[in-house]
Amino acid sequence: MDVLVSECSARLLQQEEEIKSLTAEIDRLKNCGCLGASPNLEQLQEENLKLKYRLNILRKSLQAERNKPTKNMINIISRLQEVFGHAIKAAYPDLENPPLLVTPSQQAKFGDYQCNSAMGISQMLKTKEQKVNPREIAENITKHLPDNECIEKVEIAGPGFINVHLRKDFVSEQLTSLLVNGVQLPALGENKKVIVDFSSPNIAKEMHVGHLRSTIIGESISRLFEFAGYDVLRLNHVGDWGTQFGMLIAHLQDKFPDYLTVSPPIGDLQVFYKESKKRFDTEEEFKKRAYQCVVLLQGKNPDITKAWKLICDVSRQELNKIYDALDVSLIERGESFYQDRMNDIVKEFEDRGFVQVDDGRKIVFVPGCSIPLTIVKSDGGYTYDTSDLAAIKQRLFEEKADMIIYVVDNGQSVHFQTIFAAAQMIGWYDPKVTRVFHAGFGVVLGEDKKKFKTRSGETVRLMDLLGEGLKRSMDKLKEKERDKVLTAEELNAAQTSVAYGCIKYADLSHNRLNDYIFSFDKMLDDRGNTAAYLLYAFTRIRSIARLANIDEEMLQKAARETKILLDHEKEWKLGRCILRFPEILQKILDDLFLHTLCDYIYELATAFTEFYDSCYCVEKDRQTGKILKVNMWRMLLCEAVAAVMAKGFDILGIKPVQRM
């Protein structure tokens, strides 16, 4: 729906429907008037006039709503889809759901956007035994285009492509609106709740590089949906339950017997875990005690529960160090949260007749899925299947989620598709109403294209990886002698921005479904599509106004008073690129592929460089360096680029700095 009227779309749709019915009623009355003398003729004519008057008022009201200024950025593809949708409906009123294909043009010679609906409509007409050339269809569509604020002209090319050229004044006005009102999307997700399940490490084990992707991708998806106006609940489904806690608690009792009264100095939890695992594997007596501890924990024994909480707290402190460093916020809701709901889940499936017993296990076969779910093990214990079913039900019925996104590696794809199918089978949700989605991702590889490991073959600890990033970032800044021009505070801010920004961007700039090679050398390279290059580009853009002695207040005043000219081809290219931001975000809201945003920011930075090299923003005396003239409309273009880049960085979880 046209974002210009997004806030009143429901009202407009209602008005449009009323217009259609009124038009039909007028036609009916006209026909009645031709039936010859009628005692009601005067009454009918009077009614006809009233209907025409109401119709005229509604049309004016509709146009006024469309022309009403909006503080939100316009999704130009959505606007053009609406315009062409009207034209296609008018040209081919009998076609049901005709294709509506509007895309950005790949080359400037083909205009700014293309409507490629004619070929699809030709195929639809062929099935109705109407043979019409796609080019004729394209001509018919263009004849029916309604008056609108955005199209300058259309051209028909090739077999029936409609090339669309935007009005310069329209683009200029939208850029001005962006500068005056800020980078804003319409409230697409108003009154809608999204749950994003991500990160989800195991308690008592350190986070490793495998958790990095889920954490970074999940946080970025959450930020995007928040920006689009959704109510987002970020959940950390930590592994805080199960057999491993039996051995950890038993080891805690032996190593710190006074743990109930004196807080145990566990120190390195990874070492503590390895010690307990070694004993579990080699000492039969210890193994028995560990199992007893699990039973006592499930029975909510107070001393055992305290030991469990102590271990969780120590682990949580370590996890929070990483979340704080990466600026990630999560609500912890681990497997333990769902323990009391498991019995009801099993009973519900049993009552509905979905449970079969196989070798002591209770299993559920789901139509279309090759592997059954095991909801009760042969020893009577529950499984990941049971807890994931309990979690999805709680999120649907108690949280009342409109959308649930699971950011978990590709290896869990079959598991989640089976969980989703089981939830649909039992009637918990309808996929046409509620979107439940597994946003899978590939593994992190080393430069040898094998799973990323330390030299000794161990999994890379995430804290060590972040520390290495900080070190290399500082080395790079000193290599560029930035330590000689930045204050200590600015240098530290730049170090953190580059280190964490590069790690996040290297991940997010790859298609999440693919494995990606982790290389500090590549991610810290300040050439090409890297965070280092983009962060430098951003600080350069921000410095243009500063070096011209133009402050924020002057820019805001200019935004309200200065028309943005787009006469130079590089100005025009940059202006259009800036305004593509909403359509890029809409695509990602649909498919959750964040590399599209990275590609866009890189494209924007490249378009800016072309513009800056061709168009003087500030004209100086070549001898003295004195500023002779400031081309304010170009300064405003710089500001618009910076505003969109800053919002893009924010969605990606990257913190730019003003000086680098």
Curated annotation (Swiss-Prot):
Disease per UniProt entry: Leukodystrophy, hypomyelinating, 9: An autosomal recessive neurodegenerative disorder characterized by delayed psychomotor development, severe spasticity, nystagmus, and ataxia associated with diffuse hypomyelination apparent on brain MRI.
Catalytic activity, reaction form: tRNA(Arg) + L-arginine + ATP = L-arginyl-tRNA(Arg) + AMP + diphosphate
Organism: Homo sapiens
Name of the encoding gene: RARS1
Protein name as it appears in the record: Arginine--tRNA ligase, cytoplasmic
Binding, L-arginine: 200-202, 211, 384, 388, 412
Family annotation (SMART domains): Arg_tRNA_synt_N, DALR_1
Domain notes: The alpha-helical N-terminus (residues 1-72) mediates interaction with AIMP1 and thereby contributes to the assembly of the multisynthetase complex.
EC identifiers of the protein: 6.1.1.19
Enzyme class: ligase
Subcellular location: Cytoplasm; Cytoplasm, Cytosol
Classification via Gene3D superfamilies: Arginyl tRNA synthetase N-terminal domain (3.30.1360.70), HUPs (3.40.50.620), Isoleucyl-tRNA Synthetase, Domain 1 (1.10.730.10)
Positions of region (Interaction with tRNA): 529-543
Residue numbers of N-acetylmethionine PTMs: 1
Record GO terms (molecular function): arginine binding; arginine-tRNA ligase activity; ATP binding; cadherin binding; tRNA binding
Family of the protein in this entry: Belongs to the class-I aminoacyl-tRNA synthetase family.
